[in-house]
Each structure stands twice: as structure tokens, then as C-alpha cells.
Curated annotation (Swiss-Prot):
The active site is at 128 (proton donor). Pathway: Cell wall biogenesis; peptidoglycan biosynthesis. Its EC number is 2.5.1.7. The modification 2-(S-cysteinyl)pyruvic acid O-phosphothioketal is found at residue 128. It is found in: Cytoplasm. This is UDP-N-acetylglucosamine 1-carboxyvinyltransferase. It is an enzyme of class 2 (transferase). Cell wall formation. Adds enolpyruvyl to UDP-N-acetylglucosamine. The lineage of its organism: Bacteria, Bacillati, Cyanobacteriota, Cyanophyceae, Synechococcales.
């Protein structure tokens, strides 16, 4: 729904109240991937024709990106689980700080705006406080493509160099396989003049989804999902209809929750090979995994400790490190969790220890000795994935837990507690109302339950 004028709404301080030691049973519907949907929304800026995105998740991050596009002049219509995007009336090439603050994915817009209009101004990105995520690779790549870039007072100002009206193809070798840089440079190169080669590119499924959609729009992108991606620039891109891939992180979170509670569930739809690193570790820890078509079933009893080390795809995803750490707290034996992607992604460790876990942290490595159970507590999640980990810990624990900081959780999990409740977990969202004024794009709720959650 597009809100055309200011209206009164409610900003709610919320918590999840969890009665622990429950079990999960049933089927979980997995939503569209947040990390894919965000970059697909940004890529709609590359065309003057309508884009229809299917399987868009209902998340606060998606709303933020919708508001950014609306501010640029894009018309958005949400209907029947589809989002229609009409970018024909884009009139602004600058993103305001108040809209992009807290949404790192907003920076993806710079590549699309620069290559389409010849210039762009985008504030430095925000997002979860999980450590330094520099944009050097984005900037260096855009400069190599022919942009002049300066950063003034937190604003990245980019303009095509000289009197040219197009970026030019080039060879770019990334120092590390950055997902954001790969996506930004793919979008920028899609309308550049000539061929661009991106070496040491990220291989994540969300990048493959972006390339698939851009090719539907008329782009010429080859070898997405490989370490070297080739883009032959085209003069213009058209419209298309595209279905967002399933969210592998949401899927993995539910599989881990089932393993942690000795439960049996089925998740669908998923793309099983996107989850191979996760299902392999769950099998190693004692769970039985069955794959049939686009569904994965898990049966879990006793869990034993296993070691994981996060890595770029196809390795173990950093976004599931915190939930898997929660699982290992009650595993038999010892385990070691090594975080290699972000230097500040262990914020959940001291909170799990408060619940009775036995974890020693040495910089980016957590050494865990499994305990029989955890104890319910009131805790505040500090970022998206640590919040999910605390909810899993609350389900494991004896007694009642109240998990706060749901503004982080709602950035990445659609209707999380209602799905858990449907699976048999005793969990309730509690509200504390206060009013504010808003004028924002909102994706319509997909069920009566979500409507009730948002009702004033």
C-alpha cells in the first residue's frame, strides 16, 4: 500500500515471550530471500520499464528499500504477493540519509544510478553492527569502470569521468569476494560500453538470482556463480517478471531450531544445494536429513558437537553462525566455531553464557562445552542473526525467556514467531505502544495474523 499523506501509526516496543523446552513439528513455508529481494529492487533502477517481483518477503528492510525507491520517483504497487515496480518517473539521483540510515543494501543503488544517469550521490551505508564492512571494493571497481568519486561529509558522490555519458568495460580483480561489491559492479557494468570481467567475484545464490533477472531484462551476463563473471554492456534494459529465490538463511534457521529441540520438520520451498554446507554439518552433528525435490526434512535426537568455520558460498554462511552456536551449547561434547567474515559477530556469546552455556571466546573463535540445558532469561538481541540465536536458545531453555530487540529480527525474518507457534512452540509477541507520524511505502500483510500484529 502506498500512503499518500501522513497518518498516525504506532511504534511499538516489542518482545517475544517464550516458554522453553518446546518441540517443533510440521511444515514451514520458506519466504523469498531478503538479501536477493533487496538487490533486485535496486536493480529495477536500471530500466524505464515495469518490473514485477514475485515472492517478496514482508520485512522492515524491504519497506526501507521501497521507501528509498519511492523517494527517487519510482511507483510501487503491492498486490497478490507481487510487487509492481514502475521506474519511468525517476527524478532524483540522490538518496537522503534519513532513508538509507541502517540499511546497508541501500548502497547498491549507486551502481544502478551511476550507470543509468551518469551520476549518483549515496550516503555511506548502515546496517547491523557486526563490524567493519568497507566499501573500498565498490569504490575502486566503479573508478575502474570510469567514474570519478569523492566522499564528502559521509556522502559518496560519483560521476562518469570527463564528457562521456557511459561507463566503460574493464577488468576488475576484487581483493576479496565481496557480495555487495560484486552486485554493485554487475549492475554498473550491465549498461557500460564494452566488456567487463570481475575476477574473484562472490558466488552467493543471491548474486546468481540478480544475474538471472538482469539477463531476463536484456543484459548479457555470463558465468554467474563462478569466480569470474563476464558482463557485456548493452544500451538499455527492459522490464520482466521475476520470482525471488527462497531464503536459505531463514530455511537454515528453522533446520537448526529443529535440531536444537530434537524435533522433526519439513521446510519448503527451498533450493537444496544452497543449503548444502548447513545440512552437511547438521548430519555430522547427528540429525537425519532427507531431500525431496524442493523440500528438506530433518529428524533430530541427540546432537553431538561439531566444528564450523564460516566462509563465502559455498562454505558455511556467516548469517547462520549465531544460530548454530546456540545449537552447539546443548550438544554432547565440545565444538569450535570460527568466524572468518566479520570481526564483530560474536555479540551473542556472552548472552548465551548468561543462560548457562559454557563458551570461551578468543577473538573470532568460540570454544563450546555442551551443557544439558539452558536457563530462561530476559535478553536483548544486538543484531539480526544474534536475535534469532537467542530465540532458539529461549526455545531450548528451561523456564520463560523474553527476547527484546525485535527491530533487528523483523529486518530478516517474516512472521517468525507465528511460524514457530504453528510448529508447536509457545511464543507470543508482546507490545508497548507509543505514537509517531509516518508517510511510508508499506508492503501489504499477507495474512490476517500479520494484520493483527500491525493493528493499532
Amino acid at each position: 500500500m502506498i500512503c499518500g499523506s501522513k497518518k498516525k501509526a504506532y511504534l511499538k516496543s516489542q518482545n517475544l515471550k517464550i516458554l522453553g523446552q518446546g518441540k517443533l513439528n510440521g511444515i514451514v513455508k520458506i519466504n523469498g530471500a531478503k538479501n536477493s529481494a533487496l538487490v533486485l529492487l535496486a536493480s529495477s533502477l536500471l530500466t524505464n520499464e515495469k518490473i514485477i517481483l514475485e515472492n517478496i518477503p514482508y520485512l522492515t528492510d524491504i519497506e526501507k528499500m521501497g521507501n528509498i525507491l519511492k523517494n527517487l520517483g519510482v511507483n510501487l504497487i503491492d498486490k497478490n504477493d507481487q510487487l509492481e515496480i514502475d521506474p519511468t518517473n525517476i527524478s532524483i539521483k540522490e538518496l537522503p540519509y534519513e532513508l538509507v540510515n541502517g540499511l546497508r543494501a541501500s548502497f547498491f543503488c549507486i551502481g544502478a544510478l551511476l550507470t543509468k544517469f551518469g551520476e549518483a550521490q549515496v550516503p555511506l551505508p548502515g546496517g547491523c553492527n557486526i563490524g567493519s564492512r568497507p566499501i573500498d571494493e565498490h569504490i575502486n571497481g566503479l573508478i575502474a569502470l570510469g567514474a570519478d568519486i569523492i566522499i564528502e561529509e559521509g556522502i559518496v558522490k560519483a560521476k562518469i569521468r570527463g564528457n562521456k555519458n557511459k561507463l566503460h568495460g574493464t577488468h576488475i580483480k576484487l581483493k576479496c569476494p565481496s557480495v555487495g561489491a560484486t552486485e554493485t559492479l554487475i549492475m554498473a557494468a550491465s549498461l557500460a560500453e564494452g566488456r567487463t570481467t570481475i575476477e574473484n567475484a562472490a558466488r552467493e545464490p543471491e548474486i546468481q538470482d540478480l544475474c538471472h533477472m538482469l539477463n531476463k531484462m536484456g543484459a548479457k551476463i555470463y558465468d554467474s556463480g563462478k569466480e569470474t563473471i563476464i558482463i557485456d554492456g548493452v544500451n538499455k534494459l527492459g522490464g520482466c517478471t521475476h520470482k525471488v529465490i527462497p531464503d536459505r538463511i531463514e530455511a537454515g534457521t528453522f533446520l537448526i531450531a529443529a535440531a536444537a529441540t530434537s524435533s522433526s520438520i519439513t521446510i519448503s520451498p527451498v533450493i537444496p544445494h544452497h543449503l548444502e554446507a548447513v545440512t552437511n554439518k547438521l548430519q555430522e552433528s547427528g540429525s537425519k536429513i532427507t531431500i525431496k525435490g524442493n523440500s528438506i526434512s530433518i529428524k533430530s535426537k541427540e546432537i553431538k558437537g561439531v566444528d564450523i568455520e564460516t566462509a563465502p558460498f559455498p562454505g558455511f554462511p556467516t548469517d547462520l553462525q549465531a544460530p548454530f552456536t546456540a545449537l552447539m551449547t546443548i550438544a554432547n561434547g565440545e565444538s569450535k566455531i570460527t568466524e572468518t567474515i566479520f570481526e564483530n559477530r560474536m555479540n551473542h556469546i556472552h548472552l548465551l553464557n548468561k543462560m548457562g552455556a559454557r563458551i570461551k571466546l578468543n577473538e573470532n573463535v568460540a570454544y563450546i562445552k555442551g551443557v544439558k540445558t539452558l536457563n530462561g532469561m530476559d535478553l536483548i538481541g544486538s543484531d539480526l542473526r544474534s536475535s534469532a540465536a537467542l530465540i532458539i536458545a529461549g526455545i531450548i531453555a528451561e523456564g520463560t525467556s523474553n527476547i527484546y530487540g525485535l527491530e533487528h529480527l523483523d529486518r530478516g525474518y517474516e512472521n517468525f514467531e507465528l511460524k514457530l507457534k504453528k510448529l508447536g512452540i509457545k511464543i507470543t509477541r508482546e507490545f508497548n505502544k507509543s505514537t509517531f507520524e509516518e508517510n511510508e511505502f508499506k508492503i501489504e500483510p499477507k495474512s490476517e495474523d500479520i494484520s493483527n500484529l500491525r493493528a493499532a
